[in-house]
């Protein structure tokens, strides 16, 4: 596997190229094949996680992207996909989700690693099934696998659903008169941060900066998308 990573990473080879592959995987959550974008994303994840008192989310993200990427090499999938970070983006989301919704136990970390590895295999399967229609699975492997694990966790003592909310109807939004522009700006940035389940406006800034570094259009449309979603909620 190490030789494969060295060949796909470029002339330098070694662990530095593998780190770049992991960062590209993080950036691919928002379709950016850039290690620098992934670095800013990872900084945003760690900042927001520790700021919210959930630092384990950052380490979960790091473990998830590593396990899912290594799994791709172990399964012998095309190295080009690995070089572009396409094995890592589902894993990093799994790594953010598990510590967010479940308590800190050994079984949670084992489940996180297993689910992250599973997303790489599930991604290949879904892509093969949908190939005739030229449809990519994108982050559906993360959604599907995480749903299965979280549903099962409610029946497992080793996977405490400490932070998982009970089903409830949505509450009414505050009246427009009580909303300040500063609050809207914070909500807007937090909406971008929530792509990785991080509730931090600073994280949102890091994500926008990472997008802008790779694609100004991607940053613009991410900003517009979050703004439109926020305005829709306020209007309703």
Regions found by a protein language model. Name each.
Residues 42-46, 50-119:
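Early transmembrane hairpin of solute transport permeases
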Residues 1-77, 187-198, 203-214:
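N-terminal signal-anchor module of multipass membrane proteins
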Residues 86, 91-168:
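Membrane-interface helix-loop-helix junctions at boundaries between adjacent transmembrane segments
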Residues 40-48, 65-71, 113-121, 142-152, ...:
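Hydrophobic core segments of alpha-helical transmembrane domains in multi-pass membrane transport
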Residues 58, 78-93, 134-136, 218-228, ...:
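Short, non-helical or kinked segments that cap or interrupt transmembrane helices
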Residues 36, 47, 59, 87, ...:
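A residue-identity detector for tryptophan
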